[in-house]
Amino acid sequence: MPVKPNQPRPSTKQDPSSGASRQRFGYVTGWLHRIRSVPAIAHFIRAGDRFNDRMGNQFGAAITYFSFLSLIPILMVSFATAGFVLASNPDLLTGLINRIVNSISDPSLARTLKNTVNTAVRQRTTVGLTGLLIALYSGVNWIGNLREAIHAQSRDVWERQPHEEEKIYLRYLWDFLSLIGLLLALVITLFLTSVAGSAQATIVRALGLNGIDWLRPVMTLIALSISIFANYLLFLWILWVLPRHNPRRGPLLRGTLMAAIGFEALKFAMTVALPELATSPSGAAFGSVIGLMTFFYFFARLTLFCAAWIATADPKTDINTQAPLPGA
């Protein structure tokens, strides 16, 4: 009978390096747990979870698509307005046509563009009315989609509740009034921003303070504050009036301020990035389209994330009432 060789006994001695690794891992885990337990950071984590669970990225992409699609009838109305202006100023129309002809070396292409301009001027009424009707329809649907996306982030549960159902004509009427309100809010925002920018140099010149160096950053800070205040009014309307719900006042005001500051940062980033895009041939051709789509997408994501942040201000309410996606 063969004798089995002696098997070496497994060593029970622990590797010092593995013990140190576990200690470091435990330290990092505890450190991350302490960071996550900070109320402000925990709030952002809850908002991010709700934003992702309730398809914030997908809703943002849908809002971007509908926003870009709504630009087509707006361009039709713009061309019709230009047609009315050119029709009332024959000299301006003649000068525009001559510039087109002189700037294009290909005679057939110049002739085609000349006929296009003349056709646009002749059909300005038809194009304007058609574009206005399409813009009204697409604008009402756009505001409705934005409202539903904000509702998805703001509801206590994911599914639409029976009491939220409303008649279709009432929904379209409310969306139409909401669209008018949004346009008024945009006009006020643009007015305050433009006044803040133009009045800055006028006030400095009127007071004879051109030579004071430290006044320039102060005036820039004042103009920035006015612009953020205008953004605040716009997002207060979007996050409070548009979805027709009553969140707690504190989270609403703080979330609106966060959206206003983020929107101002987005505008600054776009003013820096768009000139850089225009330097390349492809950027010159598609830069404006890419810039608009990027702006709409980040605007939608910012709006929906702030809506989720406002809705998750109370951790107890969020944990007890948040429901999973249907079929999850």
UniProtKB/Swiss-Prot annotation:
<feature type="transmembrane region" description="Helical">
    <location>
        <begin position="221"/>
        <end position="241"/>
    </location>
</feature>
<keyword id="KW-0997">Cell inner membrane</keyword>
<feature type="region of interest" description="Disordered">
    <location>
        <begin position="1"/>
        <end position="22"/>
    </location>
</feature>
<dbReference type="InterPro" id="IPR005274">
    <property type="entry name" value="IM_pro_YhjD"/>
</dbReference>
<feature type="compositionally biased region" description="Polar residues">
    <location>
        <begin position="9"/>
        <end position="21"/>
    </location>
</feature>
<feature type="transmembrane region" description="Helical">
    <location>
        <begin position="255"/>
        <end position="275"/>
    </location>
</feature>
<comment type="similarity">
    <text>To E.coli YhjD.</text>
</comment>
<dbReference type="Pfam" id="PF03631">
    <property type="entry name" value="Virul_fac_BrkB"/>
</dbReference>
<dbReference type="InterPro" id="IPR017039">
    <property type="entry name" value="Virul_fac_BrkB"/>
</dbReference>
<keyword id="KW-0472">Membrane</keyword>
<protein>
    <recommendedName>
        <fullName>Uncharacterized protein Dda3937_02003</fullName>
    </recommendedName>
</protein>
<keyword id="KW-1133">Transmembrane helix</keyword>
<dbReference type="GO" id="GO:0005886">
    <property type="term" value="C:plasma membrane"/>
</dbReference>
<feature type="transmembrane region" description="Helical">
    <location>
        <begin position="290"/>
        <end position="310"/>
    </location>
</feature>
<feature type="transmembrane region" description="Helical">
    <location>
        <begin position="176"/>
        <end position="196"/>
    </location>
</feature>
<keyword id="KW-1003">Cell membrane</keyword>
<feature type="transmembrane region" description="Helical">
    <location>
        <begin position="126"/>
        <end position="146"/>
    </location>
</feature>
<feature type="transmembrane region" description="Helical">
    <location>
        <begin position="66"/>
        <end position="86"/>
    </location>
</feature>
<keyword id="KW-0812">Transmembrane</keyword>
